[in-house]
Each structure stands twice: as C-alpha cells, then as structure tokens.
A protein has these predicted regions:
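Intrinsically disordered, low-complexity boundary segments flanking structured domains
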Residues: 8, 17, 37-39, 115, ...
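Boundary at the C-terminal end of the N-terminal hydrophobic targeting segment
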Residues: 16-23
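Short amphipathic beta-strand and strand-loop transition segments with alternating hydrophobic
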Residues: 25-30
Length: 247
C-alpha cells in the first residue's frame, strides 16, 4: 500500500506551487543561477493576467520561462493575457476553456505552443502567432468559435491535427509558403471559412482537413501536393470549384 501511495504522489510534485506574486502562482524550475520559474496552476483566476519577465522571491530574481500544463485551464473569468518575452514554452491546455479570454499577446520568444493550449476559448477574436513558432500543435486553437482572424507566420512548417477545428467564425486563412504539411481535420468544422490559400510548399493535405467547411466555395490545390487524405473536403456543401493538380 505504501508503494502505491508513493507512485500516486509523484505526478503532483511536478506541478507544486512554490509561491504567489501579484495573484499569479509560480513553481521554481531552477534554484541556481540563472534562477527560473514557470507559471503553474491558477484555478479561478479572474481579470487580466499580466505575467512579468522576472519575479523577486526570497532574495533572488527569477526569470519566467514557461506556462505549465493547464495553468489557467477553465478560468471562466480570465479576460486577457500578456506573456513576457522571457517565455519560450506554452504547454498543453495552458489556457484551454477560458470563454471570456478575448485578447492574448504571444511574444517572439515563444517557440512551442502545446496541444490544445487555447482550445475552447470561444471569446478569442484574433491571434497572431509569432515567427519563432515552427509547429502549431494538435488542437491548439480548436473550438475557438469567435476567432475571425489568424496570422500564421512563415516560420511555421507544420500545422497539426485539429489545430483550428470548429473555429466557425474564421472566414479566411492564408497558409504561408513555409508549410509542408496540413494535418488531419486542421480546419474541420470551420463552417464560416469562405477562402483558403494552400501554398506551393504543401505536399500533404490530411484526412478531413477541410471537412464540414460548408462556406468554402472554391479551392486550388497546388502542384506540390502529392497526397490528399480521406474525406479532406467532405460535406463542403458550398464548394463549386476544385482544381486538382497532376501531381
């Protein structure tokens, strides 16, 4: 029984809260120079979260480098987030299901946005992904039904499964020339999407990538594409014109 208890406790040690500053909880990730911390669980946080680059604690100044898994998940009254230039990683579910979140600033220091990081943020209207990000992970912005505009930089090479699925407010998307792979169901359920630009760099369009995009009227698939997945354009009831390349 003691052994079982030991293994149950281990997962919780990684998300322990070490201290709170200005209403935000942090966990220490390095106690030696350079001193670093991550933003950890903040249940029931309300209002605007302004995360600083550094935080003083016990005589040391700590650099904020990451926002941990589920840090603000289900914070129904979180309205905006400012992420500092010191942060490189936003982990999975970090801001998932925050319906009142309308504004987020993601700095150029961020290289990784985790799975479902902003999924279910129905109040989010626009997102600019910085040019430091190379992959948009699984379901990163899925279910953001209020999202009308997204800027994808030329640094992105892969858009993974469900990244923008069910973003029903999204009307137009330009996929940059750097992208080589459009994952499964990436824009599935984006019923408001009327136009999409697929770049000459893309070689693969995944299963169901544009499934249920009922507002889509035309699409041109470039010669670079060699694989179009199953159901890629299924139930696109408004689609009247498709150009498929010889490739």
């Amino acid at each position: 029984m003691k052994k079982l208890l030991f293994f149950i406790l281990i997962p919780f040690l990684g998300i322990a809260q070490d201290f709170t500053a200005n209403g935000i909880n942090y966990t220490i990730t390095s106690r030696t120079a350079p001193f670093t911390i991550s933003v950890t669980d903040n249940p029931n946080f309300t209002g605007a979260a302004e995360i600083p680059e550094t935080v003083a604690y016990n005589g040391n100044r700590y650099i904020v480098t990451a926002i941990t898994r589920g840090a603000f998940m289900h914070c129904n009254n979180l309205t905006s987030v400012t992420i500092p230039n010191s942060v490189t990683t936003i982990r999975e579910n970090a801001f998932a299901d925050c319906p009142d979140l309308t504004s987020v600033t993601i700095p150029n220091s961020v290289t990784s946005i985790g799975d479902r990081a902003f999924s279910g943020c129905t109040g989010l209207i626009s997102v600019t992904i910085p040019n430091s990000v190379t992959d948009i992970e699984n379901g990163a912005f899925a279910g953001c039904s209020g999202l009308t505009s997204v800027t994808i930089p030329n640094s992105v090479t892969t858009i993974r499964e469900n990244a923008f699925a069910d973003c029903s407010g999204l009307t137009s998307v330009t996929i940059p020339n750097s992208v080589t792979s459009i994952g499964d169901y990436v824009f599935g359920g984006c019923s408001g999407l009327t136009s999409v630009t697929i770049p000459n760099s893309a070689t693969t369009i995944g299963d169901g990538a544009f499934q249920d995009c009922s507002g889509l009227t035309s699409v041109t698939i470039p010669n670079s594409v060699t694989t179009i997945g199953n159901f890629a354009f299924e139930r696109c009831s408004g689609l009247t014109s498709v150009t498929i390349p010889n490739s």
